[in-house]
Amino acid sequence: MTYRELINQVLIRLREDTISSDWSGAINDSSTVSAYHKVIGALINDSKRSIESYHDWLNLRETVSVSTVSGTKNYNLSSGQEIKIVDVINATTGMHLNQVSKVYLNTVKYPTDDTGEPLYYGFNGSDSSNNLKVDLSPVPTSVQTLNFEIIKHQDALTLAATVLKVPSQPVILGAWARAIAERGEDGGTQSS
């Protein structure tokens, strides 16, 4: 279901006029979409974010492949910060890497870092673009491919034709609940 269709489904439930055609560009930059429709669009994104966090949806899974470099410990995942790592597999050897704490990685490096096939990974901040970085232990001594299986939330919906990746019904109903709370039609109950 597209972003415009999602907005229209909420508007129908609110007995409001729907958006008859796609807008061009981002919704907030469009002069053809009313302010109220933009509010409903924002509530769709709020609801989408909540639904995405409730489950590890298959449609949100991605694989980030990292090629190691001999003697290099730190790697950039180039995937943003709001991800969940489900599994890490060394595609070269078939071994699964285990997540460890930064404290553990700091402990095992004295007097020098161990070298060999990576068995562990730990988070080590982010780069200037807010992409997560990981340290490997032992430090690789050869080129290997590590596959990080991640859950990554879909970017906020802004374009009319963007298709939602998670189930639409809970997103629609969540946005509708937020909309009736915003209008004061919820009978005084709290909505989240």
Would you name each region that the model predicts?
Residues 1-192:
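Glycine-enriched, solvent-exposed interface loops adjoining structured elements
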